[in-house]
């Protein structure tokens, strides 16, 4: 009986360890954005609005050149936003936005599962290719492989089979947005 229990326990642990983690570890992701320092940012509004998403990129290192967090909405009527990072805390951080800081992250709020962050680079193209907004604001498309992804799930909804979007942990505590893996 004791051996049977040990075998069952080992199998449960084996299956638990093999469960697929939805969080991508392909590229490092670390992003932090505070509403205290940027209270009017569309990023703060977006993270609280189900079905809304933005693309976030960063430029500058915060030491030799000023750091900027650039935000582009999935709503074409909303102007792009350039947030200059001035606080010492934010400038000390090393922002890593997945596959490429120039391509960035897609951050938003799903309709059913709260805050979400995805890599904005197509996971199915061997060359880093930025995803583009479609006419439907909750979808992105790769102009190279023509796959369309649904941002609520990260899954392909049109085009050849392949990998889902690279997803990162994302939280908003009412003050700070964090994306990481």
How would you name each of these model-derived features?
Residues 116-159:
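Acidic, glycine-rich flexible loop segments
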Residues 147-181:
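Short Fe-S-cluster ligation motifs
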């Amino acid at each position: 009986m004791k051996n049977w229990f040990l075998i069952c326990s080992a199998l449960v642990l084996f299956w638990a360890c093999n469960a697929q983690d939805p969080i991508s570890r392909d590229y490092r992701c670390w992003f932090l954005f505070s509403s205290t320092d940027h209270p009017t940012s569309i990023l703060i509004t977006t993270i609280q609005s189900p079905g809304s998403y933005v693309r976030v990129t960063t430029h500058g290192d915060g030491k030799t050149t000023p750091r900027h967090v650039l935000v582009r909405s999935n709503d074409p009527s909303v102007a792009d936003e350039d947030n200059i990072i001035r606080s010492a805390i934010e400038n000390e951080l090393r922002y890593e936005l997945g596959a490429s800081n120039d391509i960035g992250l897609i951050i938003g709020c799903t309709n059913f599962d709260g805050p979400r962050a995805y890599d904005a680079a197509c996971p199915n193209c061997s060359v880093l290719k930025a995803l583009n907004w479609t006419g439907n604001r909750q979808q992105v498309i790769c102009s190279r492989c023509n796959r369309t992804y649904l941002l609520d799930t990260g899954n392909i909804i049109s085009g050849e089979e392949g990998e889902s979007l690279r997803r990162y942990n994302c939280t908003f505590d009412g003050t700070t947005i964090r994306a990481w893996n």
